[in-house]
Amino acid sequence: MIFERKKYLDELIAGRGNGLVKIITGIRRCGKSFLLFDIWHNWLLEHGVTDNHIIEIQLDDFRNRRLRKPDALLDYIDSKVVDDGNPYYIVLDEVQLVEEFVDVILSLTHMRNVDVYVSGSNSRFLSSDVVTEFRGRGDEIRIWPLTFDEYFNGIGGDIRKAWLDYYTFGGLPQVALLETEEKKTDYLRGLYETTYLRDVIERNHLRNPEGMKELVRVLASGIGSSTNPTRIAHTFQSSQGVTIKRDTIKQYIDYLKDSFLIEEALRYDVKGRKYIGTETKYYFADIGIRAAILNYRQQEETHIMENIIYNELRSRGYNVDVGLVELGGKDENGKFVRRQLEVDFVVNRPPYRVYIQSAFHMPTPEKEQQERRPLLSINDHFRKIVIVGDDIHRKEDELGVLTIGLLDFLTDKKLLEQG
């Protein structure tokens, strides 16, 4: 079973020889090492690069422990690079294990005819500001867990069964390779407890690990719901009698974002063209991890579908906000009132903008009108889409609103770029 990761291969090809360090980031176990040591390695060989011009070092291998010293690593690479006019490709995995690794990598950029690629899964490397540390010499390539299209193309078979597995266990490549539901469940639970959660707690020297664990559960329980640190603090107080300060919760959320475990979707006033800072929504980078955190309770189809759509949009390279549309009008008593309608996703990647509603079912004309109303209240020329969980034929009405089935959307990579 092979997962091609063509999008990321294309990004590596586009950045080849650009003079920047290619920094492969993303949640742990999402396939960064496989991308570099298998997919990228094979592509280089197929395109004329000889094996002795590919220098690969897995720094978590105990046999390479001496190379974790800066001088030893630089001396080793120097011994392998011969100025024969052909470029060398230096690939370093778990690079954060090297002492002063930022300065070491910057030293490599001063060498002639070298192209440098680094990845890592430790929290030191996973920090979201790692690219900044490279002082403008880094080119970040963000890796996501498998999209549904990547997952289905890898495993094949019946698309509905593939969807049920993906919906339940997410898109981490190793999970897809496990044969039974029990193995998948055990793997995800162990990965969360011993890797993701421990990494965040140890890196940030948290004195209240139980508070962090409970916060993650609260966020997992509320995916797709607007919230803020103040509201979460009230939830702790009312449901558990536990006091955690708003600023502490905000800091904990930042730690989770830095580890790529969650992402934040900001609220955007579509007509006012400004961000509204009162509340945000949070989504998990992998829906299988979210399920494991909640012990596979709360498998609500509407929220899981929304999280998967969010991840799909982000993996395609779009910025994603939650849209608000304010309308004014008279109520039944003739009094002028203002109402706010929500657009699930305002999707941006210049020159494209798309407004998207996620609706698991639209069984009645009233429900369909409810989902379309926020989109029709936006008076601009950008595309407007309703994604439904049912298998339907896509249709575009006279007002330009496209309705499309979920699996159709997830497997059509060019849809958002069409006029």
Task: Report residues per predicted region.
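A cross-kingdom feature that marks ATP-driven nucleic-acid transaction machinery
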Residues: 2, 34, 45, 49, ...
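Pre-Walker A adenine-sensing motif
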Residues: 2-19
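Short regulatory helix/loop adjacent to the ATP-binding pocket of P-loop NTPases
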Residues: 124-139, 154-156
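Structural recognition of the conserved hydrophobic beta-strand(s) that form the central parallel beta-sheet
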Residues: 115-121, 142
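Short glycine-rich substrate-engagement loop in P-loop NTPases that contacts/grips substrate
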Residues: 56-86
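Conserved catalytic segments around the Walker B and adjacent sensor/switch elements
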Residues: 45-61
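Interdomain hinge/linker elements that couple catalytic modules in large macromolecular machines
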Residues: 2, 149-326
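Hydrophobic anchor at the beta1->P-loop junction of P-loop NTPases
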Residues: 24
